[in-house]
């Protein structure tokens, strides 16, 4: 029986930025919690000379090789060299491209970094990121109607990270902290266009996070109250009541990753759902 590895080398070769590979590699590696992946990322590999140098590194530290290289000659070199070294190599996009070709009845153009063209979508994401930075942590200037979504919640419910993730998807997101005893900005209630959604979690989960992170800009709470579960439960009750009173959807983030929370918000946006609910 093969002894389980405590770590392994993961080589990622790309003719672009390597983001696609990194996401795919980490998604797969996450399924093997007992084996740590040592990542070797090689972006912008577009010549045989560059590739040969990469292959030398793989030979020195053998491991799984994933690649996204549109040049068929370079792809063949990777596969042949890896076979000679006795390490597995996988073209991550090839099965997808083959499916597209079969369905569309036409071959791909095979342009390196085609997904990173500076198009309208790229500039939309940049605009959304700028918007998020200007509307973080309760900053609500007069252009709040330009927001696609406004996230509300008590401290440490992942409002800012979720806003950043949404901005990277081109969604203009603002976020507002809900603090017991401090009035919510009136401009929030007047907003007509944006979807307003509340984030909550269990008191236990929030207490755990708060104990490991600084108090931040909440002068009305001392450290003891900030991490006390009873006090947190009161904050959560206030937040839930506020959301229910105004018909804002509620998402429990206790067991959700940032990506999963953002996906839930995107689903609400797609469905145009602004009815009060808890999910």
Swiss-Prot record:
Annotated catalysed reactions: N(tele)-phospho-L-histidyl/L-threonyl-[pyruvate, phosphate dikinase] + ADP = N(tele)-phospho-L-histidyl/O-phospho-L-threonyl-[pyruvate, phosphate dikinase] + AMP + H(+); N(tele)-phospho-L-histidyl/O-phospho-L-threonyl-[pyruvate, phosphate dikinase] + phosphate + H(+) = N(tele)-phospho-L-histidyl/L-threonyl-[pyruvate, phosphate dikinase] + diphosphate
Record keyword Kinase present: yes
Signal peptide boundaries: none
Keywords: Kinase, Nucleotide-binding, Serine/threonine-protein kinase, Transferase
InterPro entries, per the entry: Kinase-pyrophosphorylase (IPR005177), PPDK_reg (IPR026565)
Binding site for ADP: 153-160
Gene Ontology MF: a single term: ADP binding
Enzyme Commission number(s) from the entry: 2.7.11.32, 2.7.4.27
Family as reported in the entry's similarity comment: Belongs to the pyruvate, phosphate/water dikinase regulatory protein family. PDRP subfamily.
Function: Bifunctional serine/threonine kinase and phosphorylase involved in the regulation of the pyruvate, phosphate dikinase (PPDK) by catalyzing its phosphorylation/dephosphorylation.
Protein name (record): Putative pyruvate, phosphate dikinase regulatory protein
